[in-house]
Amino acid sequence: MANIIKVRDDYEPIQFESTSGLNKFKICEGSSASWTDQEFTVKDLRSRIEPWLTSLFQSEHLSLLVGAGLTHAVHYLAANKAAAGMSALDLNNYKDEIDNRAKESAEKAGRKEGNLEDQLRVANELLRGLEILGDSKADNLRDELNGGMKDFAQSILSSENGIVTANEDKREQAFNTLVTFLMSFASRIGVRERLNIFTTNYDRLIEAGAEIAGLHLLDRFLGNLMPIFRSSRLDLDMHYNPPGIRGEPRYLEGVARYTKLHGSVDWVQTDRDIRRIGLPFGATDITPFFQTPSLYGATAHELMIYPNAAKDRETAGYPYVELFRDFASAVCRPNSVLVTYGYSFGDEHINRTIRDMLTIPSTHLVVISYDDPLDRIMQIYNEMGRPSQISLMIGAELADLTKLTQNYLPKAAIDKTTFRMSELLKQRMDPMQSDKEHKKQETTASDTGLEEL
């Protein structure tokens, strides 16, 4: 697959591919670029991409949307294979009806085939209808759904476990790359608004990376032993008092707001509340962690994995309505930048919000993706019709996690030494550039004088 780049003042996406030389590329037939000849190197790409991303990352409002691509990338670095995917539910009751309806739902959302989430949505709707009718088949379907949810949770845990149990050197390299990735976005000076991290993933990979990096994540949960999900959105933050200065708290650096749009493998509905249970990263089985009196005999069917909403009738869609509202309020603002990594644009809720965001002229969308097998990203790009507000980095040469962090993402540092060095280099380079321009003008003038003689 060819790589696609569109940054800065590129009018349209540019396709390029590798040549026989190491780290050398050429423009594909049918594409053209004003900033390079037919062939160029990684150094040329870096000088094109890195300053652009650096300026975008220091915008007034910055949000990062992470999809399954990040989990697969880190898992591949650690275990040399992709993470477990979402396999279809194995049902005996109403299998054909559920599969057909799930496929219809997927096609309406612009996807060719239904996935596990589509099946869960349809199966839960059917189960609710059978319960209303008092049909005896409701018990059988509920048992099958419970087993399917347990298998799905098990596949999520196996992906986490695959990273934890990988070779120590590879595991350390994978987590170091993840930390560099996260801190490239989170390294914002304290007076800027906090980075907003959104993810559609159910695993806890970002939480693990943030813990290693020392990055504080603020979410809607309150408490320590079994944090409870709060419906009210309180803009809590972290501050510190500088030594010797009282009454002037300053923002603590290394803080980000975190939202899991599709729920998490460790969120469980308990009676009227949603709680986050103490499920260790890399655990092999979730069942033992349900064996506590405070969970009221919960099973895998009570896991908050989208679209498995809370079961009381008056809050259909809870807590996902609140989570999607957080996403919309964070990105649909002037001077807002949204960066997506590993997101395939398969969720119409999210796509609709992104479309609304781009109606604000000062917003910008950066799409970073390892591939686009269904051509969904380019289809969305063309449908939105706002090329000047969208940057694209698609392909293994641009979006491979190691190459991305080493070559293209901004340096994950906001220390004063870095800023002082940048200013010093700028001051030194300006006089040098002026001298070069002055000498060039003198040479041109003398050549012109000789020609006149």
Language-model regions, residue ranges each:
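Gly/serine-rich nucleotide phosphate-binding loop at the start of the catalytic core
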Residues: 1-210, 216-217
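A short acidic (Asp/Glu
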Residues: 73-79, 205-211, 270-272, 348-354, ...
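Short, glycine/serine-rich, charged loops/turns that create anion-binding
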Residues: 69-70, 202, 263-265, 345, ...
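Flexible internal linker/loop segments at domain or repeat junctions
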Residues: 282-325, 330
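Short beta-strand/turn micro-motifs composed of small residues
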Residues: 66, 199, 262, 367-369
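SIR2/sirtuin-family catalytic core signature
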Residues: 1-64, 110, 114, 248, ...
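Extended, H/D-rich, highly charged conserved domains that either
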Residues: 80-82, 107-142, 187-303
